[in-house]
């Protein structure tokens, strides 16, 4: 009685307003301490029940973080939900493990036990085996020799048998082996994970914190969800702890460096790998993935964008990898907001082509869509401060970076002109950028010559 509805226009709602809570809404509520109120917590739990599993898994770091502040969200929300689905259970259990600190260890251990108690016996058994697998990965990272690493990989399956991957419970592996050690800064290990059906999944076991890479893949997922016609190629990232982690290797890819030095153009490489597809289809893929990669790099402030950190898949999609430098940081002190190489422009038909013009327009349209969700990109990035705990990435620095990138006070036309100028500047290949690409490659080659495999 006495209830009535007002349209969003009269309430001055944003264009992103919806009748139910979105992921973006929950982040805003959690960051402003509105979750202290019991009715708000109930609304959040109701929203969680409506979200798809992929979105829940992508946001699990934030959900666990908020639940640690308001533990009733664990008891009445996350634990009952996760205990019914194996993928959610694995994501939640390992995220609790990852967020343990001296202050939170007791709470999160209690939550893990509660989650296991509510789950079925089969799910508990599968989780236990996967926990042993994660420990095996950690032991392989610390192993002093390749013989020891091989022994650990072989012994695991003798003791435990087939096991589900912690980042994808639908994949069950029966064997794994360490193939080689790469000659890059952290000397990552290349591993092959073999399934019973004969499929093989290659991963990098990295001796460095990969939580920022996971943040990047989460942001890439949301770029795909909130824009039209652009595409960010994402891959699995699983932090083992704050010192090492696993990154999925994308099959059938080459770095732009490899293509450039094979005396083959990017367009020729793509066409020779897709003989049954038209040039237009291939160029559309290049345009969509280049726009997505550029917008992700622009949003995060990616640095260290040399030719070995940009890949192209055999089916014509460009992919950024290695997200160690963000918020404008760069080991060589470059101030490049996004990287567009001559090879990419050539694959689109040249700087004056209609395809390149459509790329610029697509980037502008997608950027306009992303500006509607400016606070969302801030909240995703600020996990570097509140969840990862990187003191160099203070929330005020991330706030200023986000405001600089999305200029929420400007009109649509002014912002569109700004992103167009950023794209145009990114297409200018400078002599310094060429020099950086050459020195990076030479450095890796020398590392490979002088590093001895132990």
Protein language model features and the residues they cover:
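Long, low-complexity, serine/proline/glycine-rich intrinsically disordered regulatory regions
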Residues: 1-19
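Hydrophobic residue at the +6 position relative to the catalytic HRD Asp in the kinase catalytic loop
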Residues: 310-312
């Amino acid at each position: 009685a006495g209830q009535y509805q007002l349209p969003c226009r009269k309430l001055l709602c944003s264009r992103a307003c919806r009748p139910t809570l979105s992921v973006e809404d929950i982040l805003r509520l959690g960051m402003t301490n509105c979750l202290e109120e019991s009715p708000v917590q109930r609304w959040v739990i109701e929203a969680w029940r409506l979200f798809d599993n992929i979105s829940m898994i992508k946001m699990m770091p934030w959900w666990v973080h908020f639940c640690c502040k308001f533990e009733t969200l664990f008891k009445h929300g996350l634990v009952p939900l996760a205990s019914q689905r194996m993928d959610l259970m694995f994501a939640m259990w390992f995220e609790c493990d990852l967020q343990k600190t001296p202050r939170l260890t007791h709470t999160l251990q209690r939550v893990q036990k509660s989650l296991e108690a509510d789950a079925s016996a089969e799910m508990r058994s599968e989780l236990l085996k996967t926990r042993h697998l994660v420990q095996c990965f950690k032991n392989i990272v610390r192993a002093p020799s390749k013989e020891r690493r091989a022994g650990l990989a072989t012994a695991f399956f003798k003791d435990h048998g087939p096991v589900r991957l912690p980042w994808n419970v639908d994949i069950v592996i029966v064997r794994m082996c360490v193939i080689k050690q790469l000659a890059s800064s952290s000397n990552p290990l290349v591993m092959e994970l073999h399934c019973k059906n004969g499929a093989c999944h290659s991963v990098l076991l990295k001796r460095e914190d990969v939580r920022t890479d996971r943040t990047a893949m989460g942001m890439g997922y949301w770029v795909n969800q909130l824009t039209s016609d652009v595409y960010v190629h994402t891959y699995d990232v699983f932090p083992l702890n704050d010192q090492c982690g696993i990154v999925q290797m994308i099959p059938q890819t080459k770095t732009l460096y490899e293509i450039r030095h094979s005396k083959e153009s990017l367009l020729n490489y793509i066409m020779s790998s897709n003989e049954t597809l038209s040039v237009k289809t291939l160029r559309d893929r290049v345009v969509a993935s280049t726009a997505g990669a550029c917008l992700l790099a622009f949003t995060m402030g990616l640095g260290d964008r040399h030719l070995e950190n940009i890949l192209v898949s055999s089916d014509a999609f460009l992919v950024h990898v290695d997200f160690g430098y963000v918020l404008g940081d760069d080991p060589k002190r470059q101030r490049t907001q996004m990287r567009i190489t001559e090879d990419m422009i050539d694959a689109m038909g040249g700087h004056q082509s209609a395809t390149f013009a459509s790329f610029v327009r697509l980037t502008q349209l997608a950027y306009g869509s992303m500006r509607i969700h400016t606070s969302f990109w801030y909240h995703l990035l600020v996990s570097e401060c509140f969840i990862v705990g990187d003191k160099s990435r203070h929330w005020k620095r991330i706030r200023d970076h986000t405001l600089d990138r999305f200029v929420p006070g400007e009109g649509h036309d002014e912002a569109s002109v700004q992103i167009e100028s950023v794209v145009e500047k990114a297409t200018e290949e400078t002599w310094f950028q060429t020099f950086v690409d050459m020195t990076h490659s030479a450095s890796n080659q020398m590392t490979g010559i002088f590093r001895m495999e132990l």
